[in-house]
Amino acid sequence: MICVEILPPSGFVKYHRRMLRTITLFLALTTTAFGQNSAKDEAQVWQLEKAYWEYVKANDLEKYRALWHENFVGWPFVSPAPVRKDHITHWITANTSKGIKLQSYSIEQLAIQVTGDIAMDYYRINETWADSAGAEVRTDRIRITHTWIRTHGTWQIIGGMSSPVNATGQ
């Protein structure tokens, strides 16, 4: 039996080495670009969460509603069941109708994950509510998660849930 080893021409080997280098470089650049886009998207979503609370503080229900996707469904802790977009301002008006307004807040960002056109964020918020004279009426500490979807270049909330913090404030 005769064994013959067939060697590819030397140009063929050089071509494959160059191709492997090109593919490796492309993958490295693509990974970096996606990482930068993800960080940019994360920053955008956190900015929108801050805008959300500024709209609540200013009682700007129109801008607040614009943050929500038409197909939103979520479960705020003040509701006995999940709600849709047509009920998202009820908790705000329930306070303002009693003369109570969000006076201040602070957000503790805990986590965010962006995957393509979906982002999920998790945070705790401290809220101080005051009457029309500015006297503090109550403080709330709440856990919140929102699911954002990017449609037509704009992020909107499509899902969410909130609950009071536990006994240790977490």
Please provide the spans of the model-predicted regions:
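Beta-strand elements of well-folded, non-transmembrane domains
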Residues: E127-D131, W148
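Sec-dependent N-terminal signal peptides
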Residues: T22-T32
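A solvent-exposed, acidic/Ser-Thr-rich amphipathic alpha-helical stretch
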Residues: A39-W46, Y55-G116, Y122-R124, E136-D140
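Short beta-strand edge/turn micro-motifs at domain boundaries
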Residues: R141-T168
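Short beta-strand segments enriched in hydrophobic/aromatic residues
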Residues: W68, I125-E127, M161-P164
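Bacterial N-terminal signal peptides that target proteins for export
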Residues: F12-I23
